[in-house]
Each structure stands twice: as structure tokens, then as C-alpha cells.
Amino acid sequence: MREISQKDLNLAFGAGETDPNTQLLNDLGNNMAWGAALGAPGGLGSAALGAAGGALQTVGQGLIDHGPVNVPIPVLIGPSWNGSGSGYNSATSSSGSGS
């Protein structure tokens, strides 16, 4: 197997030598400017709302990178007839009517 060089990593992931915070600030400024520019015809309030929307978009996209990738959910989902349900099976449970 071939060893992966730093150049290969940069090409594959676009990592480069830039600071991630610098990229985040560039994206934040760019999205806020677009939001303000698109909201400007509606007045100052719309421009401010557009800039805030651009900021929220950037922050939301940045949070995706820091979230967990695989989170096990402790809820059994599925039909009970194949054993993947919640364990309750109305056909086999007793309702107290006696037998």
C-alpha cells in the first residue's frame, strides 16, 4: 500500500495550510453581505434580517462538521411481527381475560 503524502491529503480534503477560523470568517462575511444585499431593496430592516440569515446559515453549516456522525438511538423501531419492534406484541400479550 502506498503512503499518503501531505499533497495527496490537501488534494483529497482541500485542507491546505489555511486556518479554519479564517475560512469561517470569510464565509460569514460573504454570506452576510449576500443576505444584506438581497434584503436591501426592502429597506434597512430587511437588509439586517438578510445579514442575520446569512450569519445563521454559516453557523449552521459550520455546526454540521462538529456534530456526531453515528449516534445510536435506543428506540426500537419496526414491526413487532419480525422481532424488531418495541417488544409489545398484542397477539401474545394477555389482556387479563384469563385462559
Curated annotation (Swiss-Prot):
Keyword Signal part of the UniProt annotation: yes
Cleavable signal peptide: 1-15
Ranges of Low complexity composition bias in the record: 87-99
Family: Belongs to the class IIa microcin family.
UniProt entry keywords in alphabetical sequence: Antibiotic, Antimicrobial, Bacteriocin, Ion channel, Ion transport, Signal, Transport
Source organism: Klebsiella pneumoniae
Protein name stated in the entry: Microcin E492
Signal is among the record's keywords: yes
A GO BP entry: monoatomic ion transmembrane transport
Serine microcin E492 siderophore ester: modified positions: 99
Start and end residues of each stretch annotated as Disordered: 80-99
Function: Channel-forming bacteriocin. Forms cation-selective channels. Active on enterobacteria, with highest activity against E.coli. Not active on other Gram-negative bacteria, Gram-positive bacteria or fungi. The unmodified protein is active against E.coli and S.enteritidis. When the siderophore ester is present at Ser-99, antibacterial activity against these species is increased and activity is also detected against E.cloacae and K.pneumoniae. Neutralized by its immunity protein MceB.
Post-translational modification: The C-terminal Ser is modified by attachment to a siderophore similar to enterobactin, which can bind one atom of iron. The modification consists of an ester linkage of the serine carboxyl to O6 of a glucose which is linked by a C-glycosidic bond to the 5'-benzoyl of a linear triester of N-(2,3-dihydroxybenzoyl)serine. Presence of the siderophore ester increases the antibacterial activity of the protein.
Residue runs in coiled coils: none
Assembly description: Multimer. Possibly forms a homodimer or a homotrimer.
Gene, per the UniProt record: mceA
